[in-house]
Swiss-Prot record:
The active site is at 63 (proton donor). Catalyzes the decarboxylation of orotidine 5'-monophosphate (OMP) to uridine 5'-monophosphate (UMP). Substrate binds at residues 11, 34, 61-70, 117, 179, 188, 208-209. GO terms for molecular function: orotidine-5'-phosphate decarboxylase activity. The gene is pyrF. It comes from Streptococcus pneumoniae (strain ATCC 700669 / Spain 23F-1). Gene3D superfamilies: Aldolase class I. Belongs to the OMP decarboxylase family. Type 1 subfamily. GO terms for cellular component: cytosol. Pathway: Pyrimidine metabolism; UMP biosynthesis via de novo pathway; UMP from orotate: step 2/2. Keywords: Decarboxylase, Lyase, Pyrimidine biosynthesis. This is Orotidine 5'-phosphate decarboxylase.
Length: 233
């Protein structure tokens, strides 16, 4: 099922910066928030408990990639935090992804990273030594993710349709690199607007700097949310 709230990437260096940002929003507004490596390493597990205590949904974006037993044990810990979604690298393999699923349980969604949206085809071929097209690599990882019993993948919006065709229509496609029309692209190589992401079939969209660094973050959030949901029935 599609998530009507854009997922806000909390790319902040400290707990206090997050508190200041969230204080801009009405207390009763439930947000979907992404906690990445920088914030999690700075604030620790307490940041997840804090956000959940405020009534928000949390996507813990740590991209685990290790041997199966280590990932399984880590996921058991994350399940106790009450995260709504977390992820692993599909490149870790089917056995690792199955172990992650077992450790996390079924209460939270578990998705896998295919290729980072900062990765170009030339970079993939040169540094990862994968001699296929970028799209073929993404489809391969998506199929293996589905085989492992995960809920979906992180992918570029341009890849959503082929992934759903290769897996199934309910396979979650979470797409970062979302920018409203006219916004700076930054370090993302493959970007798309919220409206285009909806039309192409994305289930979740992740938006960071266009919201967190906006002059009015609350207004920016609602503008993006309106663009994302404008054609919903």
């Amino acid at each position: 099922m599609r998530e009507h709230r854009p997922v806000i990437a909390l790319d902040f260096p400290s707990f206090e910066a997050v508190k200041e940002f969230l204080a801009l929003f009405p207390a009763e507004e439930s947000l979907y928030l992404k906690v990445g490596m920088e914030l999690y390493y700075a604030a620790g597990p307490e940041i997840v408990s804090y956000l959940k205590g405020l009534g928000h949904s949390v996507f813990l974006d740590l991209k685990l990639h290790d041997i199966p037993n280590t990932v399984k044990s880590a996921m058991k810990v994350l399940s106790q935090l009450g995260v709504d979604m977390t992820n692993v690298h599909a490149a870790g393999g089917v056995e690792m992804m199955k172990a992650a699923r077992e450790g996390l349980g079924s209460q939270a969604k578990l998705i896998a990273v295919t290729q980072l949206t900062s990765t170009s085809e030339a970079q993939m071929q040169e540094f990862q030594n994968i001699q296929t097209s970028l799209q073929e690599s993404v489809i391969h990882y998506a199929k293996k993710t589905a085989e492992a019993g995960l809920d979906g993948v992180v992918c570029s919006a341009q890849e959503v349709q082929v992934i759903k065709q290769a897996t199934n229509p309910d396979f979650i496609c979470l797409t970062p690199g979302i920018r409203p029309a006219g916004a700076a692209v930054g370090d993302q190589k493959r970007v798309m607007t919220p409206a285009d992401a909806y039309q192409i079939g994305s289930d979740y969209i992740v938006v960071g700097r266009p919201i967190t660094q906006a002059e009015d973050p609350v207004a920016a959030y609602h503008t993006i949310k309106d663009e994302w949901t404008q054609d919903w029935n």
